[in-house]
């Protein structure tokens, strides 16, 4: 079996790791970075991912897609999506199935399709390091992701050409990375994971028995729409408001200016983790009739903290719920681990330390721990790691809608997965021939307040008074946290099964089409690379030939020189086009035309070599004379 890589598909940054021996190792990307910006940009004929995409965002804001993870598995009408529409420079549109999609270069795309571009970059990074093709991956998701979001993440993996061996929760992965090489008995850890777009808290127990470690998640909670991007937005709004007060210009209507402000806000936020004050200077941020305008705003750490205090406070509520669900108090927590880039903010660290009554561990890299844990799980699945057992949980309760619009739970939240549960239901009316099974996820009693995961019908029920037929509903929750549901009429034996796919989501046909598009793009990318290489070769050939013509001087006959110049001119014309074969042919033609020039260059080189040899011989003679004189002087002295 080939290597199974671990991928942390993050909102702001992504990271890939692999098990190297018995230790997880983070792999650097082509730019030499250990993390890759989760940014995808679409330009004319090219798709950029990571830093190259981020660099051109200011000049291409509407086609540069970031924080796509906030949209994955979401419906267009979701409150969180509607909030994002207000602040994102790119277009968020409604798909035919009601999902939140994006639009770039006039093309509508599903969130998993865009995320697949980031996963492809991670896959290529691992393949370059390992020197072999990679097909298997463990991908992490926020613990509080629902079924639709998990399914959409798996879809992204498929579109990227990966077989997703397991979906695991980010805090659990971080605990794996942290606890793998720790000894010293049992411990209960709290993983506080505040990333770019999501927040999770997991309480995890690590037991060690005869060298085998069991990582058991006791409880998990969180907020899938709280993260560093929200902190950035608060600072962006403050900077824009200050500029408006000073200049009377609202930058929110200018996408280019807003992209510059976004980058400056992100930079200022990071700087304020290590300094108490910073300046945001953006010369020529915009202009009006009176001339260019510059932004110059001083931001103190205290100001930033006042802007985001309620967001940090919002992250503390799930901590209380998770502890209560695990039936523990803060005193039972052995270690606190911080994961996610936003946990570098001193205020976050202070509030978490205050809540738990202890400082968080400093020996965990918040940007890399999740990918490393995913690589460990990859090693477990590949059979390379034998002494680790991971027991994860489902973050939300699962059930069906029953009479009166009530949600009846079959699987309670924080149940260890995989798990199976069944319950017998009956009909609500006399002679009812079909029932609709409406599957829900959430904690509210009223069905309409929970997340609808999908519905299906069981038909052909024999006519009988209400309450008589026995319909057995079975929930089968797999290790990825994805639900399979079946309903069976116990009298007739008729059964209906589905893998839950929300009324939205991508169908197998959609995914297959996107896989084919990705393959076609792969072919297009390959052609683009080959064309770029041909153009580079043409440039080198033109430059090298012109240099040799100059060096040959009068030794090159005039008619030969004309032939070469004509061939160079034809190659320059071909180089401007998109036909690789034409460029290759003209390179060949120039090589043929420059044959005489090559001969002259060779003769000149040989002549220089001969001159060099003569000079060496002459030098050698002189050296001999000096030695001889030296010898004679010694003889005289005798």
From Swiss-Prot:
Pfam families: HSP70. This is Chaperone protein DnaK. Belongs to the heat shock protein 70 family. Residues 603-618 have a biased composition (Low complexity). The keyword NAD does not apply. Residues 624-638 have a biased composition (Acidic residues). Residues 603-638 are annotated as: Disordered. InterPro entries: ATPase_NBD, Chaperone_DnaK, Heat_shock_70_CS, HSP70_C_sf, HSP70_peptide-bd_sf, Hsp_70_fam. The keyword Nucleotide-binding applies. The modification Phosphothreonine is found at residue 198. Induction: By stress conditions e.g. heat shock. One of its GO terms (molecular function) is ATP-dependent protein folding chaperone. SUPFAM superfamilies: Actin-like ATPase domain, Heat shock protein 70kD (HSP70), C-terminal subdomain, Heat shock protein 70kD (HSP70), peptide-binding domain. Signal peptide: none annotated. It comes from Vibrio campbellii (strain ATCC BAA-1116). PROSITE patterns: HSP70_1, HSP70_2, HSP70_3. Acts as a chaperone. Keywords: ATP-binding, Chaperone, Nucleotide-binding, Phosphoprotein, Stress response.
């Amino acid at each position: 079996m080939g290597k199974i890589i671990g991928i942390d598909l993050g909102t702001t940054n992504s990271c890939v790791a692999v098990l190297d021996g018995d230790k997880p190792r983070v792999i650097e990307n082509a730019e030499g970075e250990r993390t890759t910006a989760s940014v995808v940009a679409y330009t004319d004929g090219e798709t950029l991912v990571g830093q190259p995409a981020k660099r051109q965002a200011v000049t291409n804001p509407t086609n540069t897609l970031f924080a796509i993870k906030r949209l994955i598995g979401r419906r267009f009408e979701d409150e969180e999506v509607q909030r994002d529409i207000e602040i994102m420079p790119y277009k968020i549109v409604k798909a035919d199935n009601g999902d939140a999609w994006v639009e770039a270069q006039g093309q509508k795309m599903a969130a998993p399709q865009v995320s697949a571009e980031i996963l492809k970059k991670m896959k290529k990074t691992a393949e370059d390091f390992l020197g072999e093709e990679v097909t298997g991956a463990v991908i992490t998701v926020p613990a509080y992701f629902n079924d639709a979001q998990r399914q959409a993440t798996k879809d992204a993996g498929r579109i990227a050409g990966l077989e997703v061996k397991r979906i695991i929760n980010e805090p659990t992965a971080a605990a794996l990375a942290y606890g793998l090489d720790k000894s010293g008995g049992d411990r209960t850890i709290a993983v506080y994971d505040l990333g770019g777009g999501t927040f999770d808290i997991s309480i995890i127990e690590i037991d060690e028995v005869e060298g085998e470690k069991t990582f058991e998640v006791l409880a998990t909670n969180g907020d899938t729409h709280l993260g560093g991007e929200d902190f950035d937005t608060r600072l962006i709004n403050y900077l824009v408001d200050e500029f408006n007060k000073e200049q009377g210009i609202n930058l929110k209507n200018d996408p280019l200016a807003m992209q510059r402000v976004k980058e400056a806000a992100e930079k200022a936020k990071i700087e304020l983790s290590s300094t108490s004050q910073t300046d945001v200077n953006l010369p020529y941020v915009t202009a009006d009739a009176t001339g260019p305008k510059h932004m110059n705003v001083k931001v103190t750490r205290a100001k930033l903290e006042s802007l985001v205090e309620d967001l940090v406070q919002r992250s503390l509520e799930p901590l209380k719920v998770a502890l209560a669900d695990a039936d523990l108090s803060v005193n039972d927590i052995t270690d606190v681990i911080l994961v996610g880039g936003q946990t570098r903010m001193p205020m976050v660290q202070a509030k978490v330390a205050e809540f738990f009554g202890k400082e968080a561990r400093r020996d965990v890299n918040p940007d890399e721990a999740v990918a490393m844990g995913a690589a460990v799980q990859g090693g477990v699945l590949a059979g390379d790691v034998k002494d680790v057992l991971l027991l994860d949980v489902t973050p939300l309760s699962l059930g069906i809608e029953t009479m009166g619009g009530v949600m009846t739970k079959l699987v309670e939240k924080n149940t260890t997965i995989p798990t199976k549960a069944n319950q017998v239901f009956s009909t609500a009316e006399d002679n009812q021939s079909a029932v609709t099974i409406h599957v829900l996820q959430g904690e509210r009693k009223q069905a309409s307040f929970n997340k609808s995961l999908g519905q299906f019908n069981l038909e052909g029920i024999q006519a009988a008074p209400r309450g008589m037929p026995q319909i057995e509903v079975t929930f089968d929750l797999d290790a990825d946290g994805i639900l399979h549901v079946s309903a069976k009429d116990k009298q007739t034996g008729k059964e209906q099964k589905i893998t839950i796919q929300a009324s939205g989501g991508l169908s197998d046909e959609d995914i297959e089409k996107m896989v084919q598009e990705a393959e076609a793009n792969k072919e297009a990318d390959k052609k683009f690379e080959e064309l770029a290489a041909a153009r580079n070769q043409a440039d080198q050939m033109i430059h090298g030939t012109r240099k040799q013509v100059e060096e040959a001087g009068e030794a090159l006959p005039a008619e030969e020189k004309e032939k070469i110049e004509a061939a160079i001119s034809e190659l320059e014309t071909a180089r401007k086009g998109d036909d690789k074969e034409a460029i290759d042919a003209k390179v060949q033609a120039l090589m043929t035309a420059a044959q005489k020039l090559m001969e002259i260059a060779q003769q000149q080189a040989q002549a220089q070599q001969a001159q060099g040899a003569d000079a060496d011989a002459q030098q050698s003679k002189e050296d001999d004379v000096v030695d001889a004189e030296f010898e004679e002087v010694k003889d005289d002295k005798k």
